[in-house]
Structures are given as structure tokens and as C-alpha cells.
Regions:
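A short amphipathic beta-strand at an alpha->beta junction
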Residues: 247-262
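A short interface-forming secondary-structure element
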Residues: 215-217, 221-234
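Flexible glycine/acidic-rich beta-alpha junction loops that bind and position SAM and/or redox cofactors
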Residues: 174-186, 219-223, 260-265
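A structural preference for short, hydrophobic beta-strand core positions in alpha/beta folds
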Residues: 78-80, 213, 257
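Mid-to-C-terminal catalytic subdomains of enzymes
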Residues: 122, 149, 153-155, 159-203, ...
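A short linear hydrophobic-aromatic micro-motif
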Residues: 208-213, 252-254
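ATP-dependent adenylation/nucleotidyltransferase module used to activate substrates
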Residues: 1-164, 205, 220, 236-250, ...
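Short, low-order "capping/linker" segments at domain edges
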Residues: 263-273
Length: 273
């Protein structure tokens, strides 16, 4: 392990150990898994994991969260997010993520309080400062701790240490909630979210790893790692994807020639309005 990275990790452990106990918002993603691992090392049995499940959170992600907590013997709580019932959320406003995160952290705080736990930890990292992240406003408002950002961990460093610690997520692709697949202002429904989930699961089953299926009315815009474009353009793959996507309810299926990138729905977002 790189000396500077080792020192940074030691600072992380020291930071978390300053709390008597903590609840970790755990999605089974790269960041929250690494954070939960560190919290377990720092606090032992005085840490719990809380995962929110909803129609915008695929079952495969929930199952991975359950498996990890069983493997590392971490007490795990699952809460129903029900974000579609949050006032204004379904209209998909620019602050959609804020509305959801605020509700989520309040539920986590309630569970933590029932177990005598004061501190809530979440897994945003230093790289998250460079994108539009309204959810971080809720983090600040509710005094949620962000140890990875506080210590200054980048995504690359988190992956490197995750590999060092043999965490199953060290090379897992980034995931964002399914509600992020729609242009701001487009109505979000449970049916639409299920359509996205089925579409992305099909591509995963076909061997594609880094991907998003963005929805523009009846058009599915597929973002893939450009290195996998040739695989996608195989006639048998294209034909199958088109056939299945039509069954899912899409009229048109398009491959984004730029390829996968995080937050592509933010590219046309005017934050001044």
C-alpha cells in the first residue's frame, strides 16, 4: 500500500473512531461499501448499516447489500424509501435528489436514534464536489458526516484501497438511482422506473458493464463504455436489444455515440433558472 494512502486511511479510521457509534447509509456501491468497511474496523459492533429500498433501487443492489452485511456480520436495517410519495418528487424537479436524500436521512436518523446512535455517515467522496449534487445540501442541513470527503479521498483511491482489502466492490461500476435516467421535468412513475430497470438488467445480462439507459419519452438512449461499442453493434446483439426494448414499451432505441458518462442529464441543466 502506498505510504501516503496508508496515512490517509489511518486518518479515516481515527476520524470515525472519534464517534462512539455510527449508522452508515449503505447502498452497496463502491464508496459506501468502503466506508462501511472502515467504520466496522474503527467501531467494531458499534456500527449499523441502513439501506433504503424503493422502485428506483434495483433488487440486485439490495441483494448485494444484504450479502455484504451477512459476510462481515454487520447489523443491517432496510427502510422503504417511497420517494414517489414525497411531495414534488415525481415531477422530477432540479432538486429531486435533495428531496429524496432529505427524506432518507431523516429515516436513517430515526432508526439510529432507536438504537442510541447519534452519528450518521454517508459515502460521498472528493470527486463529487465537481458535479451538480443537490443531495449534499441535505447532508449539510441534517449534519450528516461525510468522512471520505472530509479526509479527501478520491474515487480512484477508494477503488485502490478496496482492492487492497479484497472488497467485492473494488471494480464495481458506478451506480446512480434509476430516477436519474429521466430529463428534469419529465414525470417519474413506478412503471417508467421498472422499464429502466428491465432495460439495464438486459444489458448487464448481455455482458455490458458500465452503462445507463436514459429515457426521452418513447426513446431509449443507451450509454455504454465506447470500448464495448463493437460488441453492441454485433447484429445478433442489436437485434435482441431492439426486440426486447420494444417489448418494454419503447418506440425507438438509440446508442449514444459519446458513450457512458455520469450525470449526462445535467449537461443541459440551467442552474440559474
Amino acid at each position: 500500500m502506498d505510504i501516503s494512502l496508508k496515512t490517509k486511511y489511518e486518518k479515516l479510521i481515527e476520524y470515525i473512531a472519534s464517534f462512539s457509534s455510527a449508522a452508515v447509509a449503505f447502498s452497496s456501491g463502491v464508496d459506501s461499501t468502503f466506508l462501511l468497511y472502515a467504520a466496522k474496523e474503527a467501531l467494531g459492533n458499534n456500527v449499523i448499516a441502513v439501506t433504503a429500498t424503493s422502485c428506483s433501487f434495483p433488487e440486485r443492489e439490495l441483494n448485494e447489500a444484504k450479502d455484504y452485511c451477512r459476510q462481515f456480520r454487520i447489523e443491517h436495517f432496510i427502510v422503504q424509501s417511497e420517494e414517489l410519495n414525497i411531495e414534488g418528487f415525481a415531477k422530477n424537479p432540479k432538486n429531486r435528489c435533495y428531496l429524496c436524500k432529505r427524506e432518507l436521512f431523516e429515516k436513517i436518523r430515526s432508526i439510529a436514534g432507536e438504537h442510541g446512535i447519534k452519528e450518521i455517515l454517508e459515502g460521498s467522496n472528493l470527486d463529487d464536489n465537481g458535479d451538480y449534487r443537490p443531495g449534499l445540501i441535505a447532508v449539510k442541513e441534517l449534519d450528516i458526516k461525510s468522512p471520505l470527503r472530509e479526509i479527501g479521498f478520491t474515487k480512484a483511491e477508494i477503488r485502490e484501497l478496496s482492492k487492497e482489502f479484497n472488497l467485492p466492490t473494488w471494480e464495481k461500476q458506478s451506480f446512480a438511482c434509476l430516477a436519474s435516467r429521466f430529463p428534469y421535468g419529465d414525470l417519474i412513475t413506478e412503471e417508467k422506473l421498472k422499464r429502466v430497470d428491465k432495460s439495464e438488467q438486459l444489458l448487464i445480462d448481455l455482458g455490458f458493464n458500465q452503462l445507463r439507459v436514459r429515457i426521452h419519452n418513447d426513446v431509449a438512449r443507451i450509454e455504454l463504455d465506447p470500448k464495448q461499442f463493437d460488441k453492441f453493434m454485433d447484429e445478433s446483439v442489436r437485434t435482441l436489444v431492439y426486440k426486447k426494448f420494444k417489448e418494454f414499451g419503447f418506440s425507438y432505441v438509440a446508442l449514444d455515440i459519446i458513450g457512458y458518462r455520469t450525470g449526462s442529464m445535467n449537461e443541459t441543466l440551467d442552474l440559474d433558472k
